Amino acid sequence: PYGIANPDARTLGMGGIETVTSADAYAVFNNPAAGLFGRQKAQVATSFFTLSDKTTYSAAGYYKFNMQHLLAGGWRTFGFDERLKDKSVSLAYAYRLNDIVALGLTADYARFVRERSGNAFSAGITAQAVVPFERGENYSALRLGAKLTGIGGFLDGPAEMKLPVAFAAGAAYDLFLSDAHALTFAGECRYTFSPVAARGVEGGIGMEYSLSLI
């Protein structure tokens, strides 16, 4: 949700790219549709990191049913001291349309304790498509993703306000050099179009190397 940092280390390391991340436990914060393209039936993770002398704690996970339906949830805090912490809860459902495309729905609730204190609610729609390619003995894939966030978002309390609505789209290419080694190249562009004061464009690019010994 608006105002609380994404706790996924992979997302931060990849330039803030969320729409085309591959399946992991933090899919609820990025793109829950991605979880349906992973090998694992379920994943759970927890983490913490410090940003600007403030600490974020988080926990998230998902579970797949029949490899076609996915339920995901996540919780995070953004800390000032032990008593003053912004908190959020995120829930998501994703459905796999076919071998290539999956869609997701998200709902977010956040409790802010800063100068603009109050409760924030919003919803989102996500999509991801994975197109596989054969390269001789090796496998590669093109991932395309999109995400509309902040739908119906508002912050109640003394400083009632609408939350930013943004659309993001990205692409990633997975290049599997062998069964153990892989490279991922990704890029994403995000446009915030409402309200006018928050309007703007931002983007990110990233590269990831993966080593699998299992």
State where each predicted segment sits.
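Subset of outer-membrane beta-barrel
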Residues: P1-I214
